[in-house]
Amino acid sequence: MHRKALGLPRNEIVQQIIDGIDDSISDFASYIPIGNVVKKLTTWQNQGAEILYLSSHSSLQNVKKDEIVLKKYDFPKGPIFYPKEKDWNFVIEEAKPDIIIEDDCESIGGEYQMTYPNLNKEWKAKLISIVIKEFGGIDNLPDDITKLKKWRS
Protein backbone atom coordinates (compact mmCIF):
# COMPACT_ATOMS: atom_id res chain seq x y z
CA MET A 1 0.00 0.00 0.00
CA HIS A 2 1.11 3.59 -0.40
CA ARG A 3 3.21 4.87 2.49
CA LYS A 4 0.80 7.60 3.64
CA ALA A 5 -1.82 4.93 4.34
CA LEU A 6 0.19 3.51 7.22
CA GLY A 7 -1.87 3.44 10.41
CA LEU A 8 -5.12 4.48 8.76
CA PRO A 9 -8.31 2.39 8.89
CA ARG A 10 -9.00 0.39 5.74
CA ASN A 11 -12.01 2.50 4.73
CA GLU A 12 -9.91 5.70 4.85
CA ILE A 13 -7.21 4.12 2.69
CA VAL A 14 -9.82 3.10 0.12
CA GLN A 15 -11.15 6.66 0.13
CA GLN A 16 -7.63 8.05 -0.40
CA ILE A 17 -7.34 5.96 -3.56
CA ILE A 18 -10.78 6.98 -4.79
CA ASP A 19 -10.02 10.66 -4.17
CA GLY A 20 -6.56 10.31 -5.75
CA ILE A 21 -5.18 13.40 -4.05
CA ASP A 22 -2.13 11.82 -2.39
CA ASP A 23 1.07 11.72 -4.47
CA SER A 24 2.30 8.61 -2.65
CA ILE A 25 -0.48 6.60 -4.34
CA SER A 26 1.44 6.58 -7.63
CA ASP A 27 4.90 6.32 -6.03
CA PHE A 28 4.96 2.54 -6.45
CA ALA A 29 8.59 2.13 -5.37
CA SER A 30 7.72 3.53 -1.92
CA TYR A 31 4.87 1.11 -1.21
CA ILE A 32 4.91 -0.77 2.10
CA PRO A 33 3.65 -4.24 3.08
CA ILE A 34 0.30 -4.71 4.78
CA GLY A 35 0.39 -6.46 8.14
CA ASN A 36 2.51 -9.59 8.38
CA VAL A 37 2.35 -10.50 4.69
CA VAL A 38 6.07 -11.28 4.46
CA LYS A 39 5.89 -13.67 7.41
CA LYS A 40 2.76 -15.35 6.00
CA LEU A 41 4.26 -15.86 2.53
CA THR A 42 7.51 -17.14 4.03
CA THR A 43 5.54 -19.62 6.15
CA TRP A 44 3.80 -20.94 3.03
CA GLN A 45 7.06 -21.07 1.10
CA ASN A 46 8.68 -23.06 3.93
CA GLN A 47 5.90 -25.63 3.48
CA GLY A 48 6.74 -26.02 -0.20
CA ALA A 49 4.53 -23.38 -1.81
CA GLU A 50 6.01 -21.62 -4.81
CA ILE A 51 5.28 -17.92 -4.42
CA LEU A 52 4.37 -16.06 -7.62
CA TYR A 53 3.46 -12.40 -7.78
CA LEU A 54 0.86 -10.89 -10.12
CA SER A 55 1.33 -7.21 -10.82
CA SER A 56 -1.41 -5.00 -12.16
CA HIS A 57 1.22 -2.92 -13.93
CA SER A 58 1.51 -3.41 -17.67
CA SER A 59 4.89 -1.70 -18.08
CA LEU A 60 8.20 -3.28 -17.16
CA GLN A 61 9.26 0.07 -15.68
CA ASN A 62 6.52 -0.14 -13.02
CA VAL A 63 7.05 -3.87 -12.45
CA LYS A 64 10.66 -2.99 -11.59
CA LYS A 65 9.23 -0.77 -8.85
CA ASP A 66 7.33 -3.80 -7.53
CA GLU A 67 10.65 -5.67 -7.45
CA ILE A 68 12.21 -2.87 -5.41
CA VAL A 69 9.48 -3.18 -2.77
CA LEU A 70 9.66 -6.99 -2.68
CA LYS A 71 13.44 -6.88 -2.15
CA LYS A 72 13.38 -3.98 0.32
CA TYR A 73 10.98 -5.79 2.65
CA ASP A 74 12.49 -9.26 2.14
CA PHE A 75 9.46 -10.88 0.51
CA PRO A 76 10.06 -14.50 -0.51
CA LYS A 77 11.71 -14.72 -3.90
CA GLY A 78 9.42 -15.45 -6.81
CA PRO A 79 8.73 -14.26 -10.33
CA ILE A 80 6.46 -11.31 -11.03
CA PHE A 81 3.92 -11.84 -13.78
CA TYR A 82 2.16 -8.90 -15.40
CA PRO A 83 -0.22 -8.29 -18.32
CA LYS A 84 2.28 -6.96 -20.91
CA GLU A 85 -0.58 -5.66 -23.04
CA LYS A 86 -2.39 -9.02 -22.78
CA ASP A 87 -5.42 -10.08 -20.82
CA TRP A 88 -5.22 -11.98 -17.56
CA ASN A 89 -5.89 -15.35 -19.22
CA PHE A 90 -2.48 -15.09 -20.89
CA VAL A 91 -0.81 -14.08 -17.63
CA ILE A 92 -2.37 -16.99 -15.74
CA GLU A 93 -1.45 -19.37 -18.57
CA GLU A 94 2.15 -18.25 -18.17
CA ALA A 95 2.19 -18.37 -14.34
CA LYS A 96 0.05 -21.51 -13.89
CA PRO A 97 -0.83 -20.93 -10.21
CA ASP A 98 -2.90 -23.33 -8.10
CA ILE A 99 -4.28 -20.59 -5.87
CA ILE A 100 -4.86 -16.93 -6.61
CA ILE A 101 -5.17 -14.53 -3.69
CA GLU A 102 -6.27 -11.06 -4.67
CA ASP A 103 -8.04 -8.12 -3.16
CA ASP A 104 -11.52 -7.01 -4.16
CA CYS A 105 -10.27 -3.84 -5.95
CA GLU A 106 -12.86 -1.79 -4.07
CA SER A 107 -11.12 1.54 -4.68
CA ILE A 108 -10.71 1.09 -8.44
CA GLY A 109 -14.05 -0.33 -9.49
CA GLY A 110 -14.39 -3.75 -7.95
CA GLU A 111 -14.78 -7.07 -9.70
CA TYR A 112 -14.20 -5.92 -13.26
CA GLN A 113 -10.65 -4.89 -12.20
CA MET A 114 -9.90 -8.24 -10.57
CA THR A 115 -8.09 -11.16 -12.15
CA TYR A 116 -10.14 -14.26 -11.32
CA PRO A 117 -13.59 -12.95 -12.34
CA ASN A 118 -12.18 -12.05 -15.75
CA LEU A 119 -10.66 -15.45 -16.49
CA ASN A 120 -12.21 -17.94 -18.87
CA LYS A 121 -14.20 -20.91 -17.54
CA GLU A 122 -11.26 -23.27 -18.07
CA TRP A 123 -9.00 -21.33 -15.73
CA LYS A 124 -11.74 -20.70 -13.19
CA ALA A 125 -12.25 -24.46 -12.95
CA LYS A 126 -8.52 -25.04 -12.30
CA LEU A 127 -7.85 -22.30 -9.74
CA ILE A 128 -8.69 -21.80 -6.11
CA SER A 129 -9.72 -18.16 -5.74
CA ILE A 130 -9.33 -16.34 -2.44
CA VAL A 131 -10.60 -12.76 -2.35
CA ILE A 132 -9.61 -10.44 0.49
CA LYS A 133 -10.76 -6.93 1.29
CA GLU A 134 -8.56 -4.32 -0.34
CA PHE A 135 -5.93 -3.18 2.20
CA GLY A 136 -7.22 -5.85 4.60
CA GLY A 137 -4.10 -7.99 4.35
CA ILE A 138 -3.72 -11.75 4.47
CA ASP A 139 -2.93 -12.18 8.16
CA ASN A 140 -6.25 -13.97 8.77
CA LEU A 141 -5.56 -16.65 6.14
CA PRO A 142 -4.40 -20.06 7.43
CA ASP A 143 -0.68 -20.61 7.99
CA ASP A 144 -1.10 -24.23 6.89
CA ILE A 145 -1.16 -24.44 3.08
CA THR A 146 -3.34 -27.56 3.15
CA LYS A 147 -5.96 -25.51 5.01
CA LEU A 148 -5.40 -22.60 2.62
CA LYS A 149 -6.30 -24.86 -0.31
CA LYS A 150 -9.69 -25.46 1.33
CA TRP A 151 -10.25 -21.82 2.27
CA ARG A 152 -13.27 -20.09 0.82
CA SER A 153 -13.69 -16.33 0.82
Go through each PLM region and give its residues:
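C-terminal cap/substrate-recognition subdomain and adjoining C-terminal extension
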Residues: 45-50, 58-153
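Alpha-helical substrate-recognition element adjacent to the catalytic core
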Residues: 1-82
